[in-house]
Regions:
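Acidic donor-binding segment of Leloir-type glycosyltransferases
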Residues: 64-111
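Acidic donor-binding/catalytic loop of UDP-sugar-dependent glycosyltransferases
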Residues: 87, 136-153
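N-terminal membrane-anchoring/stem segments of glycan-assembly enzymes
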Residues: 1-41, 180, 192
């Protein structure tokens, strides 16, 4: 039995070292927004910033002013109130009276065969005037030169679609463990640097920042094609790639900021609708997704504590490598590398988030989102 543990931890250590090397090389290939010179205003195509807001009265007063304070010469902001029950619409109208940059679109009903968010973003697109469309969320904050630098980056690389990785504010050990591990899996596990290669089939999209050429958006089908996609942000990147357009990912941890969820319970609740959807509502894929955190983060820690001899040595190498890779990703994200020590806890939480998403979705027979229920059969039939 001891020789089997030596072989197991030796394999995990080797895979960890190779993965860490590939991750390090890959992350260095991603362009950083802060290193991009802003576009010249006399060469700036028009941009429409579009976001949907449902019951966002608490967060809008902090985020919306940053969208209206851009140094870019030709842009507008289209805010879509999606059937809010709080003061969201009043706040939007108040800002619109103070700024000619802001236009408010009010959605009062949700048509059949649409998710609320995708319908609201589609409604925003239909009134937007820009040559480029920037989809974001109602709680995201921008620095004043984000548009100028993002457009310069997209044009310099010849991209039709640019996703920026945002900085996420985190507080408390449990929240840090859950979000930082989720972020590491998203960045390192998915190998997002492959997206920037034209021949790669890899795709990406995050709700905080997606800048897309209007032609690419329309020819790919836009949010109408994603009407029942729970992870519409990721799938927008997919359909743009499928339509033959060029897509890229950049880093804007300082320039684009968001407080994703407050507290670990809200983090777990917030991804319950997403995790199973990201795995195509496939139970076997979900079961397989539980294995990497178990193999690379949890069992090496147990090996260091419980194993002996070479098995413990290899377990230690595997654990140290994963912690170093986690610290490297956190450091690039402007977070303390010491948060990497929460990696095994984050792995446990990550596996629980997947398991909970599968169990809740199957138990309910679908997804409940913002007081609306969407049957699982219908969601599966309309996946891109």
């Amino acid at each position: 039995m001891h020789i089997l543990w030596i072989a197991y931890f030796g394999l995990i250590a080797a895979c960890s070292l190779i993965g860490a090397a590939l991750c390090g090389l890959g992350l260095r290939q991603l362009p950083w927004l802060k290193r991009t010179e802003p576009v010249r205003n006399d060469h700036a195509p028009s941009i429409s910033i579009i976001f949907a807001a449902r019951d966002e009265a608490e967060k809008l007063p902090a985020a919306l002013p940053t969208l209206l304070a851009q140094t870019y010469s030709d842009y507008e902001v289209v805010a879509v109130n999606d059937r809010s029950r709080d003061a969201t619409l009043d706040i939007l109208n108040q800002f619109a009276r103070a700024s000619k940059l802001l236009r408010v679109c009010n959605v009062t009903e949700l048509p059949p065969k649409w998710l609320g968010k995708t319908h609201a973003l589609d409604a925003g697109y239909r009134v937007a005037r820009g040559e480029w469309l920037l989809f974001t969320d109602a709680d995201v904050c921008f620095t004043p030169d984000v548009l100028s630098r993002a457009m310069a980056l997209a044009e310099a690389r010849g991209w039709d679609h640019l996703t920026l990785l945002a900085g996420i504010e985190m507080h408390g050990v449990w929240e840090i463990a859950a979000i930082s591990y989720f972020g590491m899996v998203f960045v390192a596990g998915n190998g997002i640097w492959h997206i920037n290669r034209p021949r790669s089939r890899a795709y990406n999209g995050v709700g905080a920042f997606q800048l897309v050429r209007r032609e690419a958006y329309e020819r790919s089908g836009g949010h109408k094609r994603l009407a029942l996609e729970v992870i519409d942000d990721m799938k927008l990147g997919k359909i743009i790639k499928l339509a033959g357009f060029r897509s890229g990912t950049g880093v804007a941890f300082d320039e684009v900021r968001v407080r994703w969820q407050s507290g670990v319970r809200n983090v777990i609740a917030g991804v319950t609708k997403n995790m199973f959807a990201a795995l195509g509502y496939n139970v076997m894929l979900a079961a397989g997704a539980l294995l990497p955190p178990l193999a690379f983060s949890i069992t090496p820690l147990l090996g260091v504590i419980l194993a002996t001899g070479w098995a413990r040595v290899f377990a230690g190498i595997a654990l140290a490598t994963v912690l170093a890779m986690h610290a490297f990703v956190l450091g690039h994200a402007g977070q303390s590398p010491f948060y990497a020590l929460t990696d095994p806890l984050g792995a446990i939480l990550f596996d629980w988030m997947i398991s909970r998403s599968v169990i809740v979705t199957l138990w309910q027979g679908g997804v409940k989102w913002r007081d609306t229920f969407y049957p699982l059969d219908e969601l599966r039939k309309n996946m891109v």
